[in-house]
Amino acid sequence: MGHGVLDSHRRPKEETLRTMTTELTGVIAEHIAAVNAFDTDAIVATFAADAYVNDNRREIHGVDAIRRWVEQEMVGDRVTLEVREVLDHHGDIIVRARYDGTFDKTNLPDELVMSNYFSIREGKIISLAVIRNQHSPY
């Protein structure tokens, strides 16, 4: 298995993760730029009306709730994102980014890198999951 030979039920890695880059396009590029500009209206405009966000195991549903989350925790805490890696996984986009800001950093690593799992439909974010993953030994 370590030599690239996979059983018939698994796809080779290059088919599963089609693109690995640090370049952003479309609504995700707009979203990250708006976050880094602390622009509440522009951030909210990247989401569909019925979008779903899971931020560190907290569920936020609908554009009104997302606006409150953005105002308080993104813009309010001056969060910035430095993109480290972008992966296209069957049309969903995974963005690994370094997070910084004025939020409480107690018990967090000096360099906080989190994974952002985006699903996009019709040019809008329909779901976003923000997760602080742990390194996998696999």
Identify the meaning behind each predicted range:
Residues 50-61, 73-76:
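A short gly/proline-enriched turn/hairpin at secondary-structure junctions
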Residues 2-46, 137:
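Short, low-complexity N-terminal intrinsically disordered segments enriched in polar/charged residues
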Residues 1, 5-7, 29, 53, ...:
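Intrinsically disordered, low-complexity peptide-like regions
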Residues 36, 60, 99:
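Short glycine/serine/threonine-biased micro-segments
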Residues 12-23, 67-138:
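A beta-strand edge to alpha-helix "cap/lid" segment located at domain peripheries
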Residues 32, 58, 85-87:
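Structured beta->alpha junctions
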Residues 31, 43-44, 51, 62, ...:
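Hydrophobic pocket/interface hotspot
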